[in-house]
């Protein structure tokens, strides 16, 4: 299994926690990490990590034509979005014998083996996962039907054609703006099922559970396995976490009116946050701002969130 991700020094703890979770599954894998600054490359190199191959940002920008030009006309987050397909392309260029490459967001955590997902994908040239929005989060469909958290490309004609299209689209336009057919690097995926016949939409609900779909499921624990609707959790996408101080984190589950208790609290969020916290030291998570709130929403939504957070008590204190 060949996975890839990319991040800078601010997300090193995320990347290390992702790596640890993959190691815990005991699968045979390589995690290809594109280091988005020199500090990250030097830091990770000193750790001599197993199952990891590191790439420098300079090499990425030298190998992918148009990347440096794109860097000049978008902000840092938008540039990182642009580098999602570029990272995949660069790895396949440097490792032509790889059968497939799977892009992962760095804030994922595996609770069981990803083999079950690859068993479902089989010989598909492309594999993507839906957000599976709950009705409360359905309005977020404007950001895309599919989530970039997991994207697989087989190193065949159709897989490379899809990857090349994604790269071309992102180099041309990749901004934090919601438009009819595009948003960042993500909404481009919506057109892929119609364009690529050998594309697989992953059915396993244990893949990419997250705050936007968490209310769809009944969470339980059986034989130390975390289940959602009796299906084993493969990986959880820990988006929207906010570090309050060195030991306290806001899960922001109140945004979707989800109580933080039971299996979800003790076996999902606490497990992840303890591991993440161990990799942080004195650093803090940089919380992404709400870039898309305007007008009355910009005033009312923060008030709503404070009230719902008070009611649902979605803060985890790791000292307790």
Where are these regions (language model features)?
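Low-complexity, glycine/alanine/valine/leucine- and proline-rich hydrophobic stretches
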Residues: 225, 231-281
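Membrane-proximal basic amphipathic "stem/tether" segments
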Residues: 283-320
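GT-A fold catalytic core of metal-dependent nucleotide-sugar glycosyltransferases
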Residues: 81-133, 152-153
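N-proximal low-complexity "stem/linker" segments adjacent to membrane-targeting elements
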Residues: 1-17
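Active-site-proximal specificity loops/subdomain of glycosyltransferases
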Residues: 40-43, 49-94
